[in-house]
């Protein structure tokens, strides 16, 4: 995941004071743990500091100063001074998220106040110019300068609310029989491997009620303060500010139209998965005409269904494309996994990670303090310091995540030469799509065979269906999930749902769109289940993950065409293709200097998001699902339970 002021990484160390720490890494990784987290923390930091994301099409007042030379001098000074402030803020935030102490939180609060004050002044100065006759870049950069902040007391309150939500999420443990479990790694492993419905329900309920109930009162304050801040800057509400990242007023209808085109594939996948869960858990748990129980669909949140692979594999007697056993047998280490990710990018002629990367990143979970484990990439805004924070384990899932996060960092390194206002992806979905693009190529059988993680085998349509099923569990299944996470929040920000009905409204929308229901009643007014996922409590929009899933297939199609791939898209690997790397670098180096359709056109020749590459990629699986579901007489869709 990308965070737009800095990125974040997995295992870092920092003492209770101000020193930066990293993770415990093997000697060959040369890490003493003194590093920042690179989750593309721009988003988190922007949230804390009321600095707009670089993509925002903020409404600004028209001034009277028509001197473009003076405007350019102002922008040059702003670029230098604000980059330095952002770097300082990134360091403070890194230290806090890799060591969740009150001391480190106080430092973030102090730096945030200075950044907010600078942003207010810079915004006022930028607004003094009449840009009507200015050149394109001067005009566009001025619209990205600073933003208006809440008053100091409210800004302090917002910063504290965000820190408290982060700390609750990062520190929460669930306990049973005097033993306590963290989300990473214990609960995550349980949800990935357990087929005990009772055990899974316990973990799901304890996590959602423990985190959701603690964060709920803070989230009410958060919605109020973020809305107030957004309106100060000319937006209708905070959801409007998020959507303007795409520089269009039509995003809501656009994403709904895109999903309608993919929905038939999703419903086929849903029906098939429901049948396999029925065979695993029985009729007392699974209704063959109803929604899926939330605690049984993959991870803690039902976001990724990848961990259902063994249950739903179409041809269980044929190989699955999960080389985790091979990685373990070959004594893979965290360091080796990151080295291979870096080498993948270099093979395309792209930039290697900086020499400081392994020293400064947190790549494994430390044992001596509480940290935020969610994998993130960080850009420290100095053009040199890029890091990852990740509590990595030796698994294929984490191997793919590494390539995803390194994709974020590659994007940041490619646009590091641009003025600060342009140092961002063309839109939020672009950044995420680039990360997934790398993981897509790495997951192919061709690539895994080339790096010795999969035995060479003859083409087998049944193995292909197994592969496509696994891919669908981590892409197609996420589309309605990510859509609902934000359509629900957009309604919150617009004030369309009474506060005491937030949770019920979420589950009604989720049941209707995703076909997933809570496993136990969720009508307690204390509950707020959506905030129990990192992105919601961490102030990240999630429509970026919806748009990225659409765009990653468009980008993959373009790169595969450029690299002269012959055959279906799902067999394409652009490893070692410098032609693909050159084309990709051209788009990445644009940053947000142009509207996103321009960036997309530079790589794909298209100016709109299209689901056709995704549908073409999964066409063999879609056809197989239609036949299999018809054979079993499956109901496509689901009945909403009366209690819903």
Feature names for model-found ranges:
Residues 392:
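Ligand-binding pocket scaffold of soluble enzyme catalytic domains
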Residues 240-245, 249-253, 272, 276, ...:
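Inter-helical turn/loop segments and adjacent helix faces that build the functional surface
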Residues 62-71, 102-103, 137, 237, ...:
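C-terminal, non-catalytic "cap/extension" segments appended to globular domains
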Residues 412-437:
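Post-HEXXH active-site segment of zinc metalloproteases
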Residues 432-458, 468-469:
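Conserved catalytic alpha/beta cores of large enzymes that bind or transform nucleotide phosphates
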Residues 45-48, 55-221, 239, 248, ...:
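N-terminal helix-rich structural modules
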Residues 179-193, 199-202, 220-389, 456-477, ...:
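Active-site-proximal, well-structured secondary-structure segments within enzyme catalytic domains
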Residues 1-44:
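Classical eukaryotic N-terminal signal peptides for Sec-dependent ER targeting/secretion
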């Amino acid at each position: 995941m990308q965070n737009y002021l800095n990125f974040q990484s997995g295992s870092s160390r920092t003492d209770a004071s101000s020193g930066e720490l990293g993770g415990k890494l093997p000697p060959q990784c040369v890490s003493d743990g003194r590093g920042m987290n690179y989750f593309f923390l721009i988003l988190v930091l922007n949230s804390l500091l009321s600095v707009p994301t670089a993509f925002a099409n903020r409404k600004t007042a028209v001034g009277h100063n028509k001197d473009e030379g003076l405007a350019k001098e102002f922008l040059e000074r702003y670029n230098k001074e604000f980059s330095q402030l952002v770097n300082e803020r990134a360091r403070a935030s890194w230290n806090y998220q890799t060591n969740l102490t009150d001391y480190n939180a106080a430092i973030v609060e102090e730096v945030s106040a200075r950044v907010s004050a600078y942003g207010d002044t810079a915004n006022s100065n930028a607004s003094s110019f009449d840009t009507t006759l200015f050149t394109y870049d001067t005009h566009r950069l001025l619209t990205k300068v600073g933003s208006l902040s809440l008053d100091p007391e409210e800004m302090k309150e917002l910063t504290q609310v965000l820190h408290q939500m982060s700390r609750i999420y990062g520190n929460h443990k669930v306990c049973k029989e005097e033993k306590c479990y963290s989300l990473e790694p214990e609960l995550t492993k349980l949800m990935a491997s357990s087929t005990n419905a009772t055990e899974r329900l316990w973990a799901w309920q304890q996590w959602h009620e423990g985190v959701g109930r603690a964060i709920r009162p803070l989230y009410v304050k958060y919605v109020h303060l973020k809305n107030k801040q957004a309106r100060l800057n000319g937006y209708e509400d905070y959801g409007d500010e998020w959507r303007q990242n795409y520089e269009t007023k039509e995003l809501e209808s656009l994403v709904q139209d895109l999903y309608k085109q993919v929905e038939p594939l999703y419903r086929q996948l849903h029906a098939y998965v429901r049948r396999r869960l029925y065979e695993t858990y029985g009729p007392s748990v699974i209704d063959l005409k109803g929604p899926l129980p939330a605690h049984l669909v993959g991870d803690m949140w039902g976001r990724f269904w990848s961990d259902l692979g063994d249950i739903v594999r179409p041809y269980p007697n044929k190989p699955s494309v999960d080389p985790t056993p091979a990685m373990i047998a070959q004594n893979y280490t965290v360091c080796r996994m990151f080295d291979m990710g870096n080498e993948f990018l270099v093979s395309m002629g792209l930039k290697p990670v900086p020499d400081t990367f392994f020293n400064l990143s947190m790549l494994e979970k430390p044992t001596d303090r509480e940290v935020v484990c969610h994998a993130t990439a960080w850009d420290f805004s100095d053009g040199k310091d890029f890091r990852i924070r990740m509590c990595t384990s030796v698994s294929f899932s984490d191997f793919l995540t590494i390539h995803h996060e390194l994709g974020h960092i590659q994007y940041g390194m490619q646009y590091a030469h641009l003025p600060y206002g342009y140092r961002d992806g063309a839109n939020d979905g672009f950044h995420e799509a680039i990360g997934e693009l790398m993981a897509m190529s790495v997951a192919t059988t061709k690539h895994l065979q080339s790096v010795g993680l999969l035995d060479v085998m003859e083409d087998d349509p049944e193995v292909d269906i197994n592969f496509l099923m696994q891919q669908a569990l981590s892409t197609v299944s996420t589309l309605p999930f990510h859509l609902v996470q934000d359509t629900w929040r957009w309604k919150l920000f617009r004030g369309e749902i009474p506060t005491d009905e937030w949770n019920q409204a979420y589950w009604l929308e989720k049941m209707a769109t995703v076909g997933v229901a809570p496993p136990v009643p969720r009508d307690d007014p204390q509950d707020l289940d959506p905030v129990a996922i990192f992105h919601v409590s961490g102030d990240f929009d999630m429509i970026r993950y919806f748009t990225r899933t659409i765009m990653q297939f468009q980008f993959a199609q373009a790169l595969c065409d450029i690299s002269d791939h012959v055959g279906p898209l799902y067999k394409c690997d652009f490893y070692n293709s410098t032609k693909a790397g050159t084309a990709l670098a051209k788009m990445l180096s644009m940053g947000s200097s142009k509207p996103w359709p321009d960036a997309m056109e530079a790589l794909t020749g298209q100016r709109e998001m299209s689901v056709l590459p995704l549908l073409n990629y999964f066409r063999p699986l879609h056809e197989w699902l239609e036949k299999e579901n018809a054979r079993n007489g499956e109901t496509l869709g689901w009945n909403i339970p009366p209690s819903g």
